[in-house]
């Protein structure tokens, strides 16, 4: 919230009772990253502003659904949408208002301030680990598809942090990072067989976390020894990691992209489930996700085996498969 928003609300209040259509997390996530505050927390702030009579959810970027629901005498919006990405949205609002002789009021846009500018200032300061941990879960609850890209150092992390592509009416970007044991090992000139230990990987990970704010998934291969998992989870949460993903293979790690998997072996479902439960019992927050990666297809065991394992792992506490 900034003075531009207050100016809009103050102007709207001159024309009657003010109803605010507040974009849901899902609506915001459809064209940019999710907001720092979730819908309910934003709603509490808005409805306690003295100019506001009521707050209703706006579930899409299009205003027509709410306009037909309320049939307001006036719609108040800054004049910045006369050009640019929201121009067609404005045209639909004008067309809809004509049905009941409604009017569009457009106060002059407040320059040199925007929610994007404020957000970028916040990002310059950085984000607390506990805030970052919860972001992946919020993304998965808000978006149909969450886009994650591999990152193995600070530079690749910054690419993921800043890359945006304009497509039709929205900007598209990656939602988070994936710390891959394959690329982490490759950048160190070592094979992808767990030669690079977790301590070394977490050191590289912390460098990435220093210069980025997006959530990160940590690929932990098969998770290692069950007795060590609780210490790994604590280190990851302390760094702000959002999720750990473990595969149900055993023995010396062999990359699943290799065509020859004859020596690879799959863990017994009941034993791998113990690892999942160990992570669940070790995490400080339920927002830290446990993802089980099932290798049945890679090892030629097929869908039936994979589905059986998926059900067992879900019951053990896996948040995602």
Q: Where on the chain are the PLM-derived regions?
A:
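Nucleotidyltransferase catalytic core that binds NTPs
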Residues: 1-130
């Amino acid at each position: 919230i900034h003075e531009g928003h207050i100016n809009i609300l103050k102007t709207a209040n001159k024309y009657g009772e003010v109803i605010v259509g507040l974009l849901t997390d899902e609506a915001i996530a459809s064209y940019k990253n999710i907001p720092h505050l979730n819908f309910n927390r934003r709603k509490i702030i808005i409805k306690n502003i003295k100019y506001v009579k009521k707050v209703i959810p706006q579930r899409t970027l299009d205003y027509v659904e709410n306009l037909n629901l309320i049939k307001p005498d006036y719609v108040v919006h800054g004049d910045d949408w006369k050009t640019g990405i929201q121009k067609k949205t404005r045209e639909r609002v004008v067309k809809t208002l004509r049905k009941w002789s409604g009017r569009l009021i457009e106060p002059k846009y407040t320059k040199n301030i925007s929610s994007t500018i404020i957000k970028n200032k916040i990002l310059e300061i950085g984000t607390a680990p506990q805030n970052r941990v919860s972001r992946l879960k919020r993304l998965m609850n808000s978006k149909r598809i969450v886009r994650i890209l591999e990152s193995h150092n600070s530079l690749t992390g910054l690419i993921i942090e800043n890359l945006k592509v304009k497509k039709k009416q929205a900007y598209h970007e990656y939602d988070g990072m994936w710390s891959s044991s394959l690329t982490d090992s490759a950048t160190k000139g070592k094979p992808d067989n767990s030669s690079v230990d977790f301590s070394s990987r977490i050191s590289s990970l912390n460098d990435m976390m220093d210069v980025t704010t997006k959530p990160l998934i940590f690929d932990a291969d098969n998770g290692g020894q069950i007795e060590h998992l609780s210490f790994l989870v604590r280190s990851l949460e302390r760094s702000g990691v959002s999720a750990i993903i473990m595969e149900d293979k055993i023995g010396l790690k062999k990359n699943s992209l290799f065509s020859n998997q004859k020596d690879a072996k799959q863990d017994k479902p009941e034993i791998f489930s113990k690892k999942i439960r160990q992570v669940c019992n070790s995490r400080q927050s339920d927002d830290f996700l446990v993802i089980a990666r099932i290798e049945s297809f890679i090892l030629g065991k097929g869908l039936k085996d994979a589905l059986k394992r998926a059900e067992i792992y879900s019951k053990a506490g896996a948040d995602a498969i």
